[in-house]
Amino acid sequence: KTMNRLRDLREDADLNQTRVAQFLGMSQTGYSKYETGENDIPTQVLIKLAGFYKTSTDYILGISDRRDPQ
């Protein structure tokens, strides 16, 4: 579920993996492993992504279906 949310958020923002990876200061390959579920997302990266997409960490993790942060 997390992988789908990451991809959906990125696509809804009309961004490619390279752009998000640049924001995070990592390679596109490294970021793509988060989207595919090959690697777990470190907490600090999760927090950065939530801020970047203006959503909650719970939404990205699939704990909540509420997209807007509370």
Task: Name each model feature, range by range.
Residues 2, 6, 56-57:
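Hydrophobic side chains within well-formed alpha-helices
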Residues 25-40:
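Recognition helix of helix-turn-helix/homeodomain-like DNA-binding domains
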Residues 25, 44-59:
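DNA major-groove recognition helix of helix-turn-helix/homeodomain DNA-binding modules
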Residues 12, 33, 44, 61-70:
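Short, charged recognition helix plus adjacent turn
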Residues 8, 12, 52-55, 66:
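Conserved amphipathic alpha-helical interaction elements at protein-protein interfaces in regulatory
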Residues 4-23, 48:
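Short basic helix-loop element that most often maps to the first helix and adjoining turn
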Residues 6, 20-21, 31-34, 60:
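Conserved hydrophobic/aromatic packing and binding residues within compact polymer-binding modules
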